[in-house]
Amino acid sequence: MNSKNSIILDNLADVSDIIDYEQNSIDYQRSIKNIEQLKSTEATEITNKLAINKAKKSSNILLEVPKETIYLDHNGSIQVITSEIIRTYVEKIFEKMEVTHLDIDKMTKNIFPKLKSINTIKDIDNQIISTASEMVTDHYDYPKIAVWILMTNLHDNTSDDFLETAEKLYNNKSESNKNAPIISENIYNFIKKHIKEINRVIRYDRDYNLTIFGFRTLEKSYLKRINKKIVERPQHLFMRVAITLHYRKNDLDRIFETYKYLSKGYFTHATPTLFNAGTTHEQLSSCFLLGIGDSLEEISECWKECALISKHAGGIGIHMTNIRVEGAYIASTQGEAGGLRVLTIFNDISRYANQGGKRPGSFAIFIEPWHGDIFFFLDLKKNTGAETERARDLFLGLMINDIFMERVYKDDVWSLMCPSQCPNLLNKYGDEFTKEYLKYESEGIYLKQIRAIDLWFKIMESQIETGVPYVMFKDAINDKSNQINIGVVNGSNLCCEIVEVSDKNNFSVCNLSSICLPRFVKIIDEVPTFNYQKLFKISRILTRNLNNIIDINFYPLDKTRITNLRDRPIGIGVQGLADVFAMFKTPFDSEIARDLNRKIFETIYYGALTESNKLAREFGTYQTYQGSPISQGKFQFDLWNFDKSQLSGMWDWELLRQEILNHGVRNSLVTTCMPTASTSQIMGWNECIEPYTENIYSRSTMAGEYFVINKHLIKDLIELGVWNSEMVDLIKYYKGSVANIPNIPDNIKAIYRTVWEIPQKSIIEMAADRAPFVDQTQSMNLYIDKPSFARLNSCLFYAWRKGLKTGMYYLRSKPASSANQFGIDIDKIKEIESKNGIKKQEDTFDLTDLTNTINQQVSGMVCRFVPAHLRKPGECLSCDG
């Protein structure tokens, strides 16, 4: 019997002397059947009588069953459970967790009424887990009770010997009883050789530091299973990753260093690395950037290549500007090209070739706005229209040239062209592109001329309706690229944070990891400090880890292997930036936050280059190093119009510059800002560089739907003495916002503004502040609660003028919702509105109304699409920023 379940059964024995009936007893069999089915009141009555009578006969004790009693069928026994037993069980959990500030009696009271239809101890656990998760509205530590139960269950059903777990994974059999090892022979042998050292280092108690959603995320997709049963603990996963990265050099010190900081939550590697480390197919890379040829043979080859990459959990970006337009002449067959209609097949492939059965396949397609099929492209994800002309599972992106933005601004003409007629436009950017574009225009080699502003409106219309296309500024990307000596960057990846050179023969790759920034905040005597030295150290560890992945990775294609070994790019990002600002009790766009933002990314960039320089001394530079900006002593911030007086002074950049000039670097690119959607759930922090979307929201797991509340906000409101159920209802009523709640001080409201309440100008400026230290780019979303052409245009132009490489990842608009979607019933809503004098809120956003105003907005408008004499100061980020 496992240790946790014995807690309950020991207490059962204390409450009553219930003895099992003989298995052949007709009454017993009937009662068990009824208990299992729990279909009628008779079940309770029969069980009650059986339990009482048997107890009386066996012990000669007049047993009075408490009023709050339920009946549990466990291993063929009839058991009596009371609220006191539940309380004792919860109390023991509190003792083991050393929790003293939570209310045992209140939790017991909330649990017991739910136990009317249970038949196993697991059901009791599930109700306690559910109750603990719901009680996050009382205190953010209640869900830790749920984690304790879940993790104890996992530990009871898995081995605390890492070798035993490894043996199970290595000796796995298929359904046909053939050998089907989950981990590789080399990994297994290494574990077997060093198991004593490993078992001394591994710390299973750290499993309990996960949040409930972190555990649920690992449980669903990451922890290894045999016959659908989990056999791996989180610490096994972290050790498996650490061993994979360093075992080939027999480097136990680096293995244990990586394990230590990974298991303590200082960083995490990307999802494919967590999925596949140590397995028979170690595909550890996150991003693949592809080019494509224009012939049918090359296109069909690309279909196969995409399927193979997606099969092994890689996200894909494909630049397809070179695909000739629909109706273009094909000399070999005297036929006509299908143009970008080929994307409907890519859409089907993405649906079929999912990522190892764990995540849907994901493809992003990039073209430039001069392509003749641009309007067809922009309609691909729309909800209306013929299904044969839609590809709603693809993600769409634009590589926008500066000349297009200039023509939109001037309300000038724009020429659409076919790449087969204008081949000199391909692989060009900046002045060279403009020169060729103007030449083709002057010669009349274009398909059609339109107002640039008409296309711009069409782009924004698609973004407002579907959230895409992404906006990448091609000239900014290439002007500031450390790979410019290799070639021109023509596309990006699935999430718009990777910008690497690729073509139909050379597919680029990137390996990612993210640093959990809140782990570097220490609060001493209520004064927060940020440990930049530790951040520097972690950046160096990750640089070496990611560099190792390049060498050990399983590559689905030679095109990916050759390019990655040649250019060796990596991507170190972050998560939990908003958590850091909350811990510092400073608003997201304050000067303190901006200073932290700059220093954090300067430190990561400095640490990454320092370690890459050390790696170059050990193994040599990457093959295409010579001729790169970094080989000439130019850092990323040297490629920007950057005021070096804004450097923190913490790091000796000139010394590092000289070391790099002397010895080079091992990696062509090192820093990025990826979304961290899944890994942020695991580590328990806010996503990436994003502000909080809401301070309270619901999240679905396999165990049900629970509320998540910003724990920093709860802590601050507890300190103010205003955290109570009424406050929770008000935050739910306002859909996660605290802006309109009267008894919250203004300084707290400023700290906990949601992304809908923070000016997008601030989001863009924060991105621009860190950009000189990000040599790839950033997954920067725009958040506009009720999108309009004017507001969206203003943001996009401001991002362009700030020199950002990514102008927009997704456009996020606020979904129409009501308070009852946040767990408040209609009567409660009416009560809140009446008590607080709130007028009924209306959420109205009609895309049709927006679209119908397009002709009115175009006339006489340039930047914000509002005539200058009607525009208020500060309305337009682009003009006034």
UniProtKB/Swiss-Prot annotation:
Site positions (Important for hydrogen atom transfer): 287, 510
UniProt site positions, description: Allosteric effector binding: 294, 324
Subunit structure: Heterotetramer composed of a homodimer of the large subunit (R1) and a homodimer of the small subunit (R2). Larger multisubunit protein complex are also active, composed of (R1)n(R2)n.
Active site location: 493 (proton acceptor), 495 (cysteine radical intermediate), 497 (proton acceptor)
GO biological process, one term: deoxyribonucleotide biosynthetic process
Gene Ontology MF terms in the entry: ATP binding; ribonucleoside-diphosphate reductase activity, thioredoxin disulfide as acceptor
Catalytic activity, reaction form: a 2'-deoxyribonucleoside 5'-diphosphate + [thioredoxin]-disulfide + H2O = a ribonucleoside 5'-diphosphate + [thioredoxin]-dithiol
Site positions for Interacts with thioredoxin/glutaredoxin: 876, 879
Cystine pairings recorded for this chain: 287-510
Family to which this protein belongs: Belongs to the ribonucleoside diphosphate reductase large chain family.
Function: Ribonucleoside-diphosphate reductase holoenzyme provides the precursors necessary for viral DNA synthesis. Allows virus growth in non-dividing cells. Catalyzes the biosynthesis of deoxyribonucleotides from the corresponding ribonucleotides.
EC number: 1.17.4.1
Domain of life: Viruses
Record site feature (Important for electron transfer), residues: 809-810
Residue spans crossing the bilayer: none
Keyword Disulfide bond: yes
Organism placement in taxonomy: Viruses, Varidnaviria, Bamfordvirae, Nucleocytoviricota, Megaviricetes
Keyword presence, Zinc: no
UniProt cross-references to Gene3D superfamilies, sorted A to Z: 3.20.70.20
Gene designation: RNR1
Activity-regulation annotation: Under complex allosteric control mediated by deoxynucleoside triphosphates and ATP binding. The type of nucleotide bound at the specificity site determines substrate preference. It seems probable that ATP makes the enzyme reduce CDP and UDP, dGTP favors ADP reduction and dTTP favors GDP reduction.
Domain named ATP-cone: residues: 69-160
Entry protein name: Ribonucleoside-diphosphate reductase large subunit
Keyword list, A-Z: Allosteric enzyme, ATP-binding, Deoxyribonucleotide synthesis, Disulfide bond, Early protein, Nucleotide-binding, Oxidoreductase
Residues noted as binding substrate in the record, renumbered to the chain: 271, 286-287, 315, 493-497, 675-679
